[in-house]
Curated annotation (Swiss-Prot):
It comes from Shigella sonnei (strain Ss046). Residues 251-545 are annotated as: E3 ubiquitin-protein ligase catalytic domain. Exists in an autoinhibited state in the absence of substrate protein, due to interactions of the leucine-rich repeats with NEL domain. Is activated upon binding to a substrate protein. Its EC number is 2.3.2.27. The gene is ipaH9.8. One of its GO terms (cellular component) is host cell nucleus. Its main location: secreted. This is E3 ubiquitin-protein ligase ipaH9.8.
Length: 545
């Protein structure tokens, strides 16, 4: 960075003397602007950067994070990048016609000036914009999220990436016809959009449109699902959610939300305990999650569900670590539909069981630990399958896809952590054939991969450290001895074989692979030894139906 000096003087040579009048006009205006600074503004630093930019003929001007309430009217005419983000700006001056990139996020802008004709990137998220000016044809990327925009102007043909999340848009813009080669990704999540224009089908199938958490009518959802399910469909991939985006942001005190799950004779004691956790991180959203959980299909229809939740809450009250993990898992669950809450409940039960395993609950019950590990493995495979399924769908709510595989296969795969009912299976796009294929794939991969996976599972390592300390120490010594004696040569051999010797990125990747292979070999040997001993003693078995 150049030395800071607010008292720039013009060099006394013929070149600068020729244009000194121009410089003087800039400097005089900037010095006057600096003297009008409000308390807390760093206008002296801003003027220093302005003068440096002008004298050095720099194409970038960065005035971000200076707490500025305004900018001078005459910005350097040659700049192609202007960054004024994280200030207190309520408006912008006339922008240089040369400007290609404008960053003015996290200000208080209510409107924008005329945009330069060559502008390629507009980043004005987190402001107070209610509308936008005409967008230049050159625009490639635009982020206008977290504003108050009700409608959009015509979108340039060149626009590749648009983020308009959390505004007040009531409709999508028209999408132009023709075989435009541009691959687009547009985000309109969490607006007020109730219908989808037919022009959305003009976009190519490589394009993606995100419209989650909007009040889409059931008619619009059904029509889109029908269109996108057609074998002849060649339009964009559309990501939606069954949420209408209108969840109540009010929440009641955490203790009240918790005690509602307990019988009346316990509520006073429970309230007193949970009152102490009111100010923990994510406590408010956890309270809202509990209230939404009570309105799920499982809560209404599953016998013993309330008792199950109450028992879980008791465990949370006794463990700060588990409570912190659970609050974090539930943090976003209230921002989507009922099935998102159900999927989060699945994840919370997984968190509890893995925590209990790590803390020693299964130290003396290897069979139960294997069963838990097997369930976690099956869930991981189902997540992989769901992820692949999402890629094949053109109209998709990812939450419904992930939950569908868990819910519909809960009984066949003995998934104790999965809810047995979901509300919107019909829009998941998961077919009966998908479920049969998924079950077969899980069982096949379990047969071939589970023991390797289990040998690297964190809770199993925690059990080994506590109950097989000597064997664990020997395994660690063997691992580090192998790394010390063989690691470098194995990495070098791998790089040479691939013709990437001397490539730093390839070396890091090869090193990670060698490390994984070493750990797999050592921990698999240890696991086989311990399981052979323990399972023969209690009659359990490694392979399970």
């Amino acid at each position: 960075m150049l030395p800071i000096n607010n008292n720039f003087s013009l060099p006394q040579n013929s070149f600068y003397n020729t244009i000194s009048g121009t410089y003087a006009d800039y400097f005089s205006a900037w010095d006057k602007w600096e003297k009008q600074a409000l308390p807390g503004e760093e206008r002296d630093e801003a003027v220093s950067r302005l003068k440096e930019c002008l004298i050095n003929n720099s194409d970038e001007l960065r005035l971000d994070r200076l707490n500025l309430s305004s900018l001078p009217d005459n910005l350097p005419a040659q700049i192609t990048l202007l960054n004024v983000s994280y200030n207190q700006l309520t408006n912008l001056p006339e922008l240089p016609v040369t400007l290609k990139k404008l960053y003015s996020a996290s200000n208080k802008l209510s409107e924008l000036p005329v945009l330069p004709p060559a502008l390629e990137s507009l980043q004005v998220q987190h402001n107070e914009l209610e509308n936008l000016p005409a967008l230049p044809d050159s625009l490639l990327t635009m982020n206008i999220s977290y504003n108050e925009i009700v409608s959009l102007p015509s979108l340039p043909q060149a626009l590749k990436n648009l983020r308009a999340t959390r505004n007040f848009l009531t409709e999508l813009p028209a999408f132009s016809e023709g075989n435009n080669p541009v691959v687009r990704e547009y985000f309109f999540d969490r607006n007020q959009i109730s219908h989808i224009p037919e022009s959305i089908l003009n976009l190519r199938n490589e394009c993606s449109i995100h419209i989650s958490d909007n009040p889409l009518s059931s008619h619009a959802l059904q029509a889109l699902q029908r269109l996108t399910s057609s074998p002849d469909y060649h339009g964009p991939r559309i990501y939606f959610s069954m949420s209408d985006g209108q969840q109540n942001t009010l929440h009641r005190p955490l203790a009240d939300a918790v005690t509602a799950w307990f019988p009346e004779n316990k509520q006073s004691d429970v309230s007193q305990i949970w009152h102490a956790f009111e100010h923990e991180e994510h406590a408010n959203t956890f309270s809202a999650f509990l209230d939404r959980l009570s309105d799920t299909v499982s809560a209404r229809n599953t016998s013993g569900f309330r008792e199950q939740v109450a028992a879980w809450l008791e465990k949370l009250s006794a463990s700060a670590e588990l409570r912190q993990q659970s609050f974090a898992v539930a943090a976003d669950a209230t921002e989507s539909c009922e099935d998102r809450v159900a999927l989060t409940w699945n994840n919370l039960r997984k968190t509890l069981l893995v925590h209990q395993a790590s803390e020693g609950l299964f130290d003396n019950d290897t069979g139960a630990l294997l069963s838990l590990g097997r369930e976690m493995f099956r869930l991981e495979i189902l997540e992989d399958i769901a992820r692949d399924k999402v890629r094949t769908l053109h109209f998709v709510d990812e939450i419904e896809v992930y939950l569908a595989f868990q819910t519909m296969l809960a009984e066949k795969l003995q998934l104790s952590t999965a809810v047995k009912e979901m509300r919107f299976y019909g829009v998941s796009g998961v077919t009966a054939n998908d479920l049969r294929t998924a079950e077969a794939m899980v069982r096949s991969r379990e047969e071939n991969e589970f023991t390797d996976w289990f040998s690297l599972w964190g809770p199993w390592h925690a059990v080994l450290k506590r109950t097989e300390a000597d064997r664990w120490a020997q395994a660690e010594e063997q691992k580090y001895e192998m790394l010390e004696n063989e690691y470098s040569q194995r990495v070098a051999d791998r790089l040479k074989a691939s013709g990437l010797s001397g490539d730093a990125d390839a070396e890091r990747e090869a090193g990670a692979q060698v490390m994984r292979e070493t750990e797999q070999q050592i921990y698999r040997q240890l696991t086989d030894e311990v399981l052979a001993l323990r399972l023969s003693e209690n009659g359990s078995q490694l392979h399970h139906s």
